[in-house]
Every structure is written in C-alpha cells, then in structure tokens.
C-alpha cells in the first residue's frame, strides 16, 4: 500500500512540473506576441497618413466626398486650414486641375422620416431624426411625425420674412418659414411648446413632453431636423408635395415641397388638374435626382456665387492669358457651375432630350396652353446634407 502511495505522489509531482513548464512557455509566447503587436502598432502610427482621431476622420471624409480628391490632399488641406472644412474644400479645389464640385450632397449617419401635408392654403415639409431605422419605423415614432404635421399646419409660427435658397423673388409674400431656419432655438421652442395630439385626437401633453417620452422609451437621440412651411397668399399659387420611398401617402425617406405659379389657376384646375399634378410630380422627381440648391440664378445665395467665382479665379491666376480671355473662361466655368446646382439651368433628368428644366416648363405650358412657373421648392432626404445650403 505504501508503494502505491509512493508511485501516486511521484506521478502527481511530475504532472505539476510539466503543467507549470507548459504554462510558463505559453505566458512567454503570449508576452512575445503582445510585444510584437505593440511594435507593429507603433510602426503603423508612425507611418499613418492621417490622425485616427474620430473627429478628424469625419472631416477628412467630408472634404473627400465633396471634392473627390486624394486622401493625402484632403488631409494636407485640413492641416493647413486648421481643420476648417470650408477653407479646406476651397484649398483643395484651388490646387487641383478640376475646380468643379463633385457633389453638393453628402451622406450623414442619421435615420428618420420625411413628411409633408397640405391643409387649406398652407403646406409643411419636415423631417424627424433618430439613430436607427428600427425606431423610425415604430408606430409611436410615425404617430409623432403626424402630430408634428398637424400642429405646425394648424398653428401660425412667428418667424417673419425668412428666405431660403430655394425661393423665387416673386414668392416672398407667401413665404413663412424656411427649411434652414429651424436652427433658431426660438422656433424650435415654439414648435415643441405646441400641444401633442394623439391618435384619438386627445391632447394631454406638449410636443416637448411627448418627444422626451419617446427619447426615454427608445434611448435614442430623437429630434426635429429640417422644417419648411409655406403659406399661400396668391390665389394663382399651386401647392404640391411629393414623397419618395413612401411608408404611406404623407411619410417616407425623402420629400419635396413645390410651389407653382399658374395664371387663372382655379379655371385651369377644372380641366387640367391631373396633368398639372403629374407634371409637378415629374419636377419633384427631378429635384430628388439632381438636388438643386436654388430655383434660379437670381435667387442663388450671393455668397455662394462670389465664393465660387473666387475659387475659379484663383485656379486660373497662374495662366498667362489676356484679361478678356480669362473673364470668358470664368464665365464659362460659372455657367457650368450654375447648370449643376440651379434648378432652371439643370438638364432635365426624366427624359433624353437634354433640354434645360426651364425649357421643359415652357414646353409644358405651351402644350397645355397655360402660363406656368416655379416659385419655390424645398427638398429633404434622410441621410443627406447639402453642403451649399446647410
């Protein structure tokens, strides 16, 4: 029996020694791998072209998306401009062969819904934002969007004469609230102080209280995004909205608010309403595809025009050409710029005739014997931001 215990003790001792050796070797191996990874990471950091700071990467992506320049050029421009995005974009465009915008719209990481509705002589287009598509499709979220539509249509907002890049000068009297105005805290407070009306048409709280309730339930950053309201003052103004990627008739992922001016509107609608609605839908689909920043050259923000002209002029400053030739080159580039961002100057995207939108509108008026023009539009799309207008 003593002999059995002796062999058992010897076996256990040998096993413990072997296991200790194996663990020590594993520990040494893990430590070596860790050191290799650390050295590799340090080498990567030394050779990296740009900072890993999240904010810097967002700025870098933004500049690259607008200009389509290389990462190196965009990163260099951001450094030289102290991370000022607007100046960095200008810097890149002045120092590359192509000074034209690649895109005026960039992607942003936001989910939500766009909604629009007409009531009496008023029309509203708005967006409600959140962090996930799951919440955006929730019944309570959609109901809050509808309540927003109803209360903003039923209540006058004390904003005054505010103009947007999408306005036509002739529409100033009818213009109540611009899509870019919501950054004003007073307007936000005014909307959120309005009563919240539920599905049963009952009101027991304010819009702010209901918004906070939804935030607490879903644990997401739910907020009102862009907002536009247009009040019809001229009897010849035709109000129209178009929702793309619909959840239903009033709610979807993008939308257009459109105001047309048609002489003798009431009489025209008696016989040609369907034609006008279909044409308004076509114009709206063009706006969604082409993403213009203004109705006409005259209504484009003068700051945008001046800024673009300065960029073009700086890009041509090293060319040894007579002044008149340089001016012609500048005008040619400006014409190309206008054709990319001005609604009436754009090439119509719904057919292959290569007509300007302005010509398409004239042809429609001629074919239907009506005098028609575009006064105003707003365009909102979830996950998109216009770099010229916002």
UniProtKB/Swiss-Prot annotation:
| Stored Pfam families | EF_TS
**What domain of life is recorded for the organism?**
Eukaryota
Give its localization: Mitochondrion
A Gene Ontology cellular component where this protein is annotated is:
apicoplast
BP term (GO), one: mitochondrial translational elongation
Stretches that traverse the bilayer? none
Does Transmembrane appear among the keywords? no
CDD domains, per the entry: UBA_EF-Ts
One of the record's GO molecular function terms? translation elongation factor activity
To which protein family does this belong? Belongs to the EF-Ts family.
Looking up HAMAP family in the UniProt record yields: EF_Ts
Q: What else is known?
A: This protein may be expected to contain an N-terminal transit peptide but none has been predicted.
Identification of the protein by name: Elongation factor Ts, mitochondrial
